[in-house]
């Protein structure tokens, strides 16, 4: 249940009499993790830029990779392979709470009709000890998915 990339699937839905276009989007790239991963950082759902780049935190203005590199005393990774290598070197896994949803652009506040990823399955197949959300929405969605189990 670790590594691998796929493409996203889309179809448009018009909610709100033509005012807002939500897209049904399926998250199709896998978590980054391995047998040494002890920390899991959960996001909500990839931004439009991340979906285009087929990897996490792909918008050039997103500070995730800069902050993480500073915390880990590493150079800022530029390629997907460098990002994966930095994460795994430090026992960090990343994934998103949401498997599919309706979303307007990249806005977490617009997310609706959520289907959660199988985080429990990832945890059972790994040695993750700590889970951190990268924001309030990710934490709330994770808590909600755990309550349903």
Language model segments and positions:
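A polyanion-binding, active-site-adjacent surface
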Residues: 23-140
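Conserved small/polar residues in nucleotide/adenosyl-binding loops
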Residues: 147-148
